């Protein structure tokens, strides 16, 4: 199959992951943490790395800052097939703290991601190589200028022949009525909606997951899929009224950062191979578990997890 059938558009940044931390330290003190890693990250970056671990290839479209951190980040991402615009801004930095309970807290600077715009992105968009090609949009709330053009971007991607997958991630500004309406417009326009259970419940404004799904599913266009990532429990999906669920395998995990992004990689690679909903959910869960079970992530080489890929012939169509 063509090498650029999966494109990822969204946020990349420099991540420092530290932990575990049992309780919040007193102001003005220093705390020693047992484990840590410096790595390239962001939702789009994590997904691109996961594709590489699975032996696949994706074209990553993003931006970096014009400082030393940006140069380092470019060096980490370009081997993945990244097309990166250097913008006049400091590189976005994230510190992720892993709590002893397994939850995470993130501190992120706006940095270069605030400058990422549709005008920067548009020259890198090419016609889809076939009618099954997919673009994953990730990390929208950290890219406000690009977010403002999301309706235009989604229309443009469809005009170029792509199917569109969307993972919004969590909004730092939290959910408001206006934001819910904005996201509902995106959901109704794309082919794959990939959210976690908290995002689903928050977007629907209901704490009951089943009720939240029932509220969101009617927003989907015909043939589109709503995927709900439920963390260690696995994932479920709804497509044209049919529901499928897959339970994740239990695993001992220190750092769950990028679990949802890794799921997206496994799920979308399976879809590109022609897999149905159930098989794609299983592939996503397997990818997520395998990636986050490894720490540090630099211990995973490209192709190390290729055994998890769904592989079956899929007939290629003429682009729409």
Q: Which role does the model predict for each range below?
A:
Residues 1-61, 68-72, 254, 319-320:
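Glycine-rich phosphate/adenosyl-contacting loop at the front of the ribokinase-like
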Residues 49, 93-97, 105, 234-237:
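Short beta-strand scaffold segments in enzyme catalytic cores
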Residues 1-7, 32, 156, 206-320:
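Conserved phosphate-binding/catalytic region of the ribokinase-like
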Residues 76-91:
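A glycine-rich helix N-cap at a beta->alpha junction
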